[in-house]
Every structure is written in C-alpha cells, then in structure tokens.
Amino acid sequence: MPNELRIGRVYRHFKGDFYLVEAVANDSETGEPFVVYRKLYGDGGLWLRPLAMFLSPVDKTKYHDAAQEYRFELQEIPSAAGH
C-alpha cells in the first residue's frame, strides 16, 4: 500500500519521533505542495517539508538499519477513553 497523507493525524519519523500533520501549503512561485507539521515533543515547533519528500521511502542505502519503509508513517493511536 502506498504511503498517503492525512491532515490532523500523527506520523512517526523513521528516526523515532512523532509529528502532527497540520496542513498542506503550496509554494507561491512553483506551486509545489509542502507538508506543515508540528513536532509532538520539546517546544512543539512547526516544520515544513516537500510533500514528495515527506511521503518518500527511507533511503536504505544511507539508513540501512531503519525499521520503517517510509520517512514518515501514519500512526493509529487508540483512544485512552476507549472510543
């Protein structure tokens, strides 16, 4: 199954940290789509990355020990309240 982007959902970066996808924004000059995402640790800062790169496979040549197939992968987080 190909990787897909879902706004408002949590993704895990292949190095282990978690991020919330806030939006997709387009570059005003090129129209290239970028993912706007917030880190779910530390200061909760916002980050921006090209959509194609966000959804790309991990470079297994460079990161041969990476467990994930994709750079960012959607996480299914169960409700603490049981919903």
Regions found by a protein language model. Name each.
Residues M1-H83:
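Mixed-charge, low-complexity intrinsically disordered regions
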